[in-house]
């Protein structure tokens, strides 16, 4: 006798749940899509794999770069345009990544941004996904290396090395 009433109530409840579900999906703010960090400047976030995020540089690098292996003593990095920048870090030369090291030799500049100069040299090389600048003396003299293997293995080094690994840009 009460069976049809129960069916109607269940039907009404299901309709309400469906309406609320569609309303929630429609009014949920979409994730902001980006191509560069400047697309995310409104909240101080960075662009990682096409989405604005407030993750630390190290967490972003782990998410962004497939199969990256970092020495546990590496605790931070910096976002740079197109690269994750690691200080006091070098490639593990025993790894497949380290074995692709291309020595560009000693470089020097007069504009005190030697690591950026090294980066620009490596960007000109086809297939380069990383660069390393090892400062030999104050005044802009150091060795520049490029890397082509896409599975970075990084370890701590002396305080004069700077390593850059390309960020994935969608």
From Swiss-Prot:
Ranges facing Intravirion side: 1
GO cellular component: host cell plasma membrane; membrane; virion membrane
Keywords: Early protein, Host cell membrane, Host membrane, Membrane, Transmembrane, Transmembrane helix, Virion
Residue pairs linked by disulfide bridges in the UniProt entry: none
Protein name, per record: Envelope protein 166
Main subcellular location: virion
Compartments where found: Virion membrane; Host cell membrane
Virion surface face of the membrane: 23-170
Keyword Transmembrane: yes
Organism: African swine fever virus (isolate Warthog/Namibia/Wart80/1980)
Bilayer disposition of the protein: Single-pass membrane protein
Induction details: Early structural protein.
Family according to the record: Belongs to the asfivirus envelope protein p22 family.
